[in-house]
């Protein structure tokens, strides 16, 4: 089905002029980002005109929009974007408030009804590992800030050389959160295999050195603590992905020997910068760890990749696939400055004026209408051939049959008859129905000053080819699917 497009009403008037100026600015900005060859100094775009010839549109199919059109980007509408952000923020705030109330109930022994903004902020910071010094110092440790990492995992050894200085661990503190199960907390994990506070774990080591880096779920940042239990937030560290397995502790299986070979090569373990001053304490911890039954299973969990936020499909969403043919008089005016290297490099620059006076275009366009937005793009020749190739082949077959009916005795040349009789010749390959989108670009060039109706210089083919190649590349990069343009309607 063909469509008659009122080209003059769409491209004239204030709206048409504004659209033409936006297209000119867009092409000009793209040329400023293109690396220019040595003989061209700059390229500027001065004007753009739609022309008076309208393109030919033929609808091929009306279907559901592509999935890519439902992905939300940063350039969404302000109203709908703010609604989505507010709804997501309110749900996150409500979940954090519930976790905060459960957290205070577990640690203080009573439940508080209601949370202010500061408590919510502190609760959210605990989940992401961003704990301020005031909030952390208010919590009471289990018994003493000893390195539970030495007991929970044989790979967390204080005798290993430093990898990243200035970071310590807060695994000595037990922070019960509502979103953590019982098997994920240090208390229950240690209780499965016996208490670490035996004769081999003196309380005196709490003042001798700092602890190893580690956070729940591997999302936290290490913090440095002194004797007053103050935290320093200036030393970030790599996240640890070590998860303890209480099952191994319950069976009392020791795997220190199996993990001793790769202890110093574990890239997920981060050590502090006080190991040199606490060598004796580190050896004591090492001997105590050999007598205990540590766990040695570390689950390497990679963080899931964020999935793009998708809009909800609606029954009124639709997509139009149409064939676009255009052989019009669109105009684009550019200037490029050519550098002459004689008698010295960049001796003089000559302005070259290029006027694109027409474009021949043949391709498949996709227009999707979703929630007051119109998405426009073109399909590549391969995609267009796969989508509409069979239909175009049927049309071409019907046209050939009509030609044969009009000329029942066609003449064949000698080369075709020879190829048909030769069995070694390969059959002709199926020809692609869709070629390049921009099939032809007509350009007029003018360089230097005109004297007596003649140009001062000629043979500017290199500059013309460069500019035309860039015009093709900009069009293919910005308009060919999966790239598309969105218009608010």
Curated annotation (Swiss-Prot):
Topology of the protein relative to the lipid bilayer: Peripheral membrane protein
Keyword Glycosyltransferase in record: no
Segments of skewed composition (Acidic residues): 72-82
Main location: mitochondrion
Top-level taxon of the source organism: Eukaryota
Subcellular location: Mitochondrion outer membrane; Endoplasmic reticulum membrane
Membrane-crossing segments per the record: none
PANTHER family linked: MITOCHONDRIAL DISTRIBUTION AND MORPHOLOGY PROTEIN 12 (PTHR28204:SF1)
HAMAP family assigned to the protein according to its UniProt record, in alphabetical order: Mdm12
Subunit description: Component of the ER-mitochondria encounter structure (ERMES) or MDM complex, composed of MMM1, MDM10, mdm12 and MDM34. A MMM1 homodimer associates with one molecule of mdm12 on each side in a pairwise head-to-tail manner, and the SMP-LTD domains of MMM1 and mdm12 generate a continuous hydrophobic tunnel for phospholipid trafficking.
Protein name: Mitochondrial distribution and morphology protein 12
